[in-house]
């Protein structure tokens, strides 16, 4: 099984869970939850500015 990492928060995604989103230009994003998907695609937030992500910088 291939291990995947959430494109937004940086946490591991268990096999059989999560969602794969493919843009028209061919870029692929993996999301562990609807929360991550909505924050990235709809709200256009930066993971570096949210404390609950692994990419958070102080």
Curated annotation (Swiss-Prot):
Zn(2+) binds at residues 6, 9, 32, 36. Binds 1 zinc ion per subunit. GO terms for biological process: translation. The keyword RNA-binding applies. Keywords: Metal-binding, Ribonucleoprotein, Ribosomal protein, RNA-binding, rRNA-binding, Zinc, Zinc-finger. A zinc finger (C4-type) spans 6-36. Pfam families: Ribosomal_L24e. Its cofactor is Zn(2+). One of its GO terms (molecular function) is structural constituent of ribosome. GO terms for cellular component: ribonucleoprotein complex; ribosome. Part of the 50S ribosomal subunit. Forms a cluster with proteins L3 and L14. Binds to the 23S rRNA. Belongs to the eukaryotic ribosomal protein eL24 family. This is Large ribosomal subunit protein eL24. The lineage of its organism: Archaea, Methanobacteriati, Methanobacteriota, Archaeoglobi, Archaeoglobales.
């Amino acid at each position: 099984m291939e291990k995947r990492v959430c494109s937004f928060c940086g946490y591991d995604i268990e096999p059989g869970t999560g969602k794969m989103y493919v843009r028209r230009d061919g870029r692929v994003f993996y999301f562990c939850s609807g929360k991550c998907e909505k924050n990235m695609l709809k709200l256009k937030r930066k993971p570096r500015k949210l404390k609950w992500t692994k990419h958070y910088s102080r």
